[in-house]
Amino acid sequence: MGKPVVAIVGRPNVGKSTIFNRIAGERISIVEDTPGVTRDRIYSSAEWLNHDFNLIDTGGIEVGDEPFLAQIRHQAEIAMEEADVIIFMTNGREGVTAADEEVAKILYRTKKPVVLAVNKVDNPEMRANIYDFYALGFGEPFPISGTHGLGLGDLLDAVSEHFKNIPETKYEDEVVQFCLIGRPNVGKSSLVNAMIGEERVIVSNIAGTTRDAIDTRFTYNQRDFVIVDTAGMRKKGKVYEATEKYSVLRALKAIDRSEVVCVVLDGEEGIIEQDKRIAGYAHEAGKAVVIVVNKWDAVEKDERTMKEFEEKVRDHFQFLDYAPVLFMSALTKKRIHTLMPAVMTASENHSMRVQTNILNDIIMDAVAMNPTPTHNGNRLKIYYATQVAVKPPTFVVFVNDPELMHFSYERFLENRIRDAFGFEGTPIRIFARARK
């Protein structure tokens, strides 16, 4: 078994995300005074008194026939199944409500340990109200204040009491982290679901359904992966709501946290300028990149369509000429099987080291094929090259004068290195340095 799992559940707007962020120690779950802001399961690692555990925030459970409410309830139920301990969050200002009683009925059926938290008890006078919560049937209620951070220690003490029989293990460093980025409604969530076969992320045809960066852990070919499914990035001019702003920042953070970035395009709508801007973030961050053309099932096509679309991709994304282009459909799952091998290859190449002697043979052969440039009568001299870093692979070429290294010749050397070693899916960087 892995680390203990703690799920926070409750009706909407009782402060689940605020408490989640308090315990996790960073702003992972988006917080607003609007019911329904958290709609998926949000994961984070946390620690209390030397106990490492995984924490899950969930959407507010509401009773109703609307499909979206049913989806959120289903997400919360999955979180409860995963959990070893459940924090049942209520609102001390509003007292016990009918909605709380409905959540309690669901919790009874789980037969999991439940710790009852009464949030928004912001001053001592409000403590008198918490006794009503005994009626929910989960023993002693713990008064807390997410706004002020009060009472969390007692709550976490009670939660960690249930960890005693759960062995702790930590995730290994070899875990590959990758994310899917793209503008809203290109099918990122659907791709995640198609890949891992579980309704991990709420899928809806409303653009912007996934508001938070949501980590999903899974194993593929005996290797561990973490996939970060990010909120769709909108054009800056359309980022009106504060929530949307947080989501864009979170998506950029997800790129920073990832080793491989899958840039998802809409095969039906084609390529727009925003797609290039989004892909540019990943390239500039030095991440490995895989280009995914989704919704290919919806495209009218003949034997030339795929080749023509790939040519458009290459034309629009000239800076990503190293990235493979995959065509697939999350809806029909056609060619979904090509995504993980491409991610694995990109990850391996992103971390690849080459032997210095072979590298220098390649460089010298390149110089013999295409002599170095001259400027004002001075010719560039290349003495030797070495690899100085990975993620991305980075090379330093020692020369007589770095100013003589024209970008076109640097590009030529990059192409020769790629011809020799591959490096599909990853940028490589070359820097000229004066030999001392």
From Swiss-Prot:
Keywords: GTP-binding, Nucleotide-binding, Repeat, Ribosome biogenesis. Residues 352-436 form the KH-like domain. GTP 1 binds at residues 10-17, 57-61, 119-122. GO terms for biological process: ribosome biogenesis. Residues 4-167, 176-351 form the EngA-type G domain. GO terms for molecular function: GTP binding; ribosome binding. It comes from the Bacteria. PROSITE patterns: G_ENGA. Gene3D superfamilies: 3.30.300.20, P-loop containing nucleotide triphosphate hydrolases. GTP 2 binds at residues 182-189, 229-233, 294-297. Belongs to the TRAFAC class TrmE-Era-EngA-EngB-Septin-like GTPase superfamily. EngA (Der) GTPase family. GTPase that plays an essential role in the late steps of ribosome biogenesis. Associates with the 50S ribosomal subunit. PANTHER family: GTPASE DER. NCBIfam families: GTPase_EngA, small_GTP. This is GTPase Der.
